[in-house]
C-alpha cells in the first residue's frame, strides 16, 4: 500500500481535511499572478483549498447532527438548516450561537456588517468555484464578489479585494480552525486539538 494511503487511514476525517487545507494553503501565492500560467496555478490551489476547507465544514456539521440526531444521517442538509433546528439553550444553544458567529449572512443597514460572516464567505466562494473560475484580477487587485439580499426588493453586491491571495485565504483558514475548536470543545471539553502539520 502506498505510504500516503497508510497515512490517510491513521487520521480521522476532520483532521485530514483541515490538514490538507493547510497543506494546499501554503501553495497559494502571496503576490498577484504575472501571466496566464501563474493565474491558472493560483486558481488550482485556491480551488483545492476551498475543497478541503468546505470538506472540514461538512465533517463537523455531520458530527453535530450525529450528536443530537436532528436529521436522518442519510439526508442532505445544510449548516443553516442545522442551526435552525438546534435548541436555544444548553449545549445545543452554545453550538447554535457559535454557528451564527461564523456563518451569518452579511447584514446591510446603511453599512455592511460582515463580522460574523467569515465562513459564509468561504462557502460562497466554494459554491462559485463549483460553477466556474473565481480568480478575477481588476486594477491590479484580486476581486471576490458576493451577493446578498438586503430585503424583498434590494439585492446588494459587495466586493472584497486583496493584493495578497495567501493572506486572504489564511484569514479564512484561521476562522475555520477557530470555529472547529470552539464547536468541538462545546461537545467535548476535553477535546485536544489535532490540527498540526502532516506529510501529505
Segment roles from a protein language model:
Residues 1-23, 27-51, 59-200:
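Acidic, Ser/Thr/Gly/Pro-rich intrinsically disordered interaction regions
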Amino acid at each position: 500500500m502506498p505510504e500516503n494511503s497508510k497515512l490517510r487511514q491513521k487520521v480521522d476525517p476532520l483532521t485530514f481535511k483541515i490538514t490538507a487545507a493547510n497543506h494546499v494553503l501554503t501553495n497559494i501565492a502571496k503576490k498577484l499572478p504575472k501571466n496566464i500560467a501563474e493565474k491558472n496555478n493560483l486558481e488550482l490551489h485556491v480551488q483545492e483549498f476551498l475543497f478541503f476547507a468546505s470538506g472540514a465544514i461538512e465533517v463537523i456539521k455531520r458530527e453535530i447532527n450525529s450528536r443530537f440526531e436532528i436529521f436522518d444521517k442519510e439526508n442532505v442538509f445544510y449548516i443553516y438548516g442545522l442551526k435552525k433546528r438546534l435548541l436555544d439553550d444548553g449545549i445545543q444553544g452554545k453550538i447554535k450561537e457559535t454557528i451564527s458567529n461564523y456563518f451569518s449572512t452579511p447584514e446591510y443597514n446603511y453599512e455592511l456588517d460582515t463580522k460574523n460572516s467569515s465562513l459564509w464567505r468561504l462557502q460562497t466562494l466554494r459554491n462559485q468555484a463549483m460553477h466556474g473560475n473565481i480568480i478575477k484580477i481588476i486594477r491590479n487587485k484580486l476581486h471576490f464578489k458576493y451577493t446578498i439580499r438586503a430585503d424583498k426588493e434590494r439585492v446588494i453586491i459587495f466586493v472584497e479585494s486583496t493584493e495578497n491571495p495567501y493572506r486572504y485565504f489564511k484569514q479564512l483558514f484561521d476562522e475555520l480552525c477557530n470555529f472547529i475548536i470552539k464547536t468541538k470543545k462545546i461537545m467535548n471539553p476535553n477535546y485536544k486539538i489535532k490540527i498540526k502539520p502532516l506529510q501529505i
